[in-house]
């Protein structure tokens, strides 16, 4: 006998269509798309192209320095491949690009641009810094009193907007060069750069710091106690001293709170994608 094809429900069709737009696979969907003068595959591709274009535009907004240094055509090509490979299952594109650096680093064609991944990471950190929640920093007097009250080995909690990056390349110099390409060309292999980022008056501030200071700040961002954060710094520089390590945080008023170690949150709640 003849087998009747069972029509999928509306919700099933909607789910298939959504998956098709994200991953490009149209299995089980095309037979249920009415042609109406345009082939079903072409009709679906119109929607997919529109979604990809939106995602590429979002990536260009998130990674302007990468776009400038690669050139528009090259960037658009790789951003389109990333969007097609990665997709976004959400209408909220805020997190699109979180692994763009890793994607570019695995492309053999870009292997000679070894700095590209870290420049992506810097731009992603800039984005996360802007989007971070607001919080009030401690003034010097309150910070001093809080340190005394918190005991021997407190936890120093930083503002939510604080981010850090330790790179083997001159990524901050590259970023500045991308803003003013008429400046002297940058040698990305001239040495490592360790960077502190925060939000100041609604804009991203960036400062090059000693690698030990960034190790210290990164440990604090993960919820480490003060002594463990100093230990992390001393693994980079055996002569690191607490007073010097605190300078970037004090100069820029980046401390939100000081609590006894017994009050600290589990480390898993402090760890973020930006602080590996």
Regions found by a protein language model. Name each.
Residues 25-30, 193-195, 249:
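Short acidic/polar alpha-helix capping motifs at helix-coil junctions
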Residues 4-135:
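N-terminal, charged low-complexity regulatory/assembly segments
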Residues 23-24, 181, 223:
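Short loop/turn hinge sites at secondary-structure boundaries
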Residues 202-276:
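C-terminal structured interaction module
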Residues 84-211, 215, 274:
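Hydrophobic packing positions characteristic
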């Amino acid at each position: 006998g003849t087998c009747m094809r069972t029509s999928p429900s509306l919700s099933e069709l909607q789910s298939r269509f959504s998956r098709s737009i994200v991953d490009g696979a149209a299995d089980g969907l095309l037979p249920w798309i009415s042609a109406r003068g345009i082939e079903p595959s072409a009709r679906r591709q119109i929607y997919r192209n529109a979604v990809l274009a939106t995602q590429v535009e979002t990536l260009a907004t998130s990674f302007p320095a990468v776009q400038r240094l690669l050139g528009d055509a090259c960037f658009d090509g790789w951003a389109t491949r990333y969007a097609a490979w990665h997709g976004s299952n959400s209408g909220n594109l805020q997190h699109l690009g979180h692994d763009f650096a890793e994607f570019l680093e695995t492309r053999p064609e870009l292997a000679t641009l070894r700095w590209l991944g870290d420049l992506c990471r810097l731009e992603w950190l800039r984005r996360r810094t802007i989007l971070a929640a607001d919080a009030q920093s401690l003034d010097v007097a309150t910070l001093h009193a809080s340190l005394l009250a918190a005991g021997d080995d407190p936890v120093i909690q930083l503002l939510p907007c604080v981010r850090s990056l330790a790179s083997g390349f001159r990524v901050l110099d590259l970023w500045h060069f991308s803003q003013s390409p008429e400046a002297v060309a940058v040698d990305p292999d001239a040495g490592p750069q360790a960077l502190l980022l925060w939000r100041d008056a609604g804009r991203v501030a960036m400062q090059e710091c000693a690698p030990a200071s960034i190790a210290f700040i990164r440990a604090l961002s993960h919820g480490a106690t003060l002594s463990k954060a100093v230990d992390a710094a001393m693994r980079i520089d055996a002569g690191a001293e607490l007073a010097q390590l605190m300078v970037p945080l004090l100069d820029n008023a980046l401390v939100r709170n000081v609590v006894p170690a017994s009050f600290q949150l589990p480390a898993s709640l402090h760890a973020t994608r930006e602080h590996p």
